[in-house]
């Protein structure tokens, strides 16, 4: 069944400005700017008032309405990112061979050494806007911080996938780097 008009309103908080032009949404806030294109969807993105963004789709099927809700959620995540930011923590888990990590001084990349006793060095470059850090008082913990939820979580996935156990029983070999905590950066 097709609905004639489906509409979703996204409220804009104070200190945040949003510009929408030709399905490209740019969100500016106190922590930075995020720009994302939604050209793949036939959605009308309008800003009728200063505190509201209106998303509309005409003659939409169920899947197209789901895309509309996904775009609304992404815009809400962008607003939350430029106001509060995102912070993910990753734990280094090992049984016998301790994993050694070296974070670049600017936090843009990480080197992982001695995973399962291998001599190979794994280098992972962080996506734009993501800062990797390690505190000495928190042993075997990495912290990834940024304003774009997609980039922060994708960088976590790249780090996790670089340390997967291959050709062994994963129930026995639990070594790796895993996400242990996801939160907003301001909530500490």
Swiss-Prot record:
<dbReference type="GO" id="GO:0022625">
    <property type="term" value="C:cytosolic large ribosomal subunit"/>
</dbReference>
<dbReference type="Pfam" id="PF00347">
    <property type="entry name" value="Ribosomal_L6"/>
</dbReference>
<dbReference type="InterPro" id="IPR002359">
    <property type="entry name" value="Ribosomal_uL6_CS2"/>
</dbReference>
<dbReference type="InterPro" id="IPR000702">
    <property type="entry name" value="Ribosomal_uL6-like"/>
</dbReference>
<keyword id="KW-0689">Ribosomal protein</keyword>
<dbReference type="InterPro" id="IPR036789">
    <property type="entry name" value="Ribosomal_uL6-like_a/b-dom_sf"/>
</dbReference>
<dbReference type="GO" id="GO:0003735">
    <property type="term" value="F:structural constituent of ribosome"/>
</dbReference>
<dbReference type="GO" id="GO:0019843">
    <property type="term" value="F:rRNA binding"/>
</dbReference>
<dbReference type="GO" id="GO:0002181">
    <property type="term" value="P:cytoplasmic translation"/>
</dbReference>
<dbReference type="InterPro" id="IPR020040">
    <property type="entry name" value="Ribosomal_uL6_a/b-dom"/>
</dbReference>
<protein>
    <recommendedName>
        <fullName>Large ribosomal subunit protein uL6</fullName>
    </recommendedName>
</protein>
<keyword id="KW-0687">Ribonucleoprotein</keyword>
<comment type="similarity">
    <text>Belongs to the universal ribosomal protein uL6 family.</text>
</comment>
């Amino acid at each position: 069944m097709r609905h004639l008009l489906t509409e979703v309103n996204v409220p804009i908080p104070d200190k945040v400005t949003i510009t929408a032009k030709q399905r490209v949404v740019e969100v500016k806030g106190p922590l930075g700017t995020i720009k994302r294109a939604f050209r793949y969807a036939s959605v009308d993105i309008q800003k009728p008032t200063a505190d509201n963004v209106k998303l509309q789709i005409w003659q939409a099927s169920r899947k197209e309405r789901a895309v509309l809700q996904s775009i609304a959620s992404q815009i809400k995540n962008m607003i939350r990112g430029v106001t509060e930011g995102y912070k993910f923590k990753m734990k280094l888990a090992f049984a016998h061979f301790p994993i050694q990590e070296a974070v670049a001084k600017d936090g843009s990349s990480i080197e992982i050494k001695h995973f399962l006793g291998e001599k190979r060095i794994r280098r992972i470059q962080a996506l734009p806007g993501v800062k990797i850090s390690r505190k000495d008082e928190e042993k075997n913990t990495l912290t990834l911080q940024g304003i774009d939820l997609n980039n922060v979580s994708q960088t976590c996935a790249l780090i996790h996938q670089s340390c997967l156990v291959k050709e062994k029983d994963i129930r026995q070999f639990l070594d790796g780097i895993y996400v242990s905590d996801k939160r907003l950066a301001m909530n500490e």
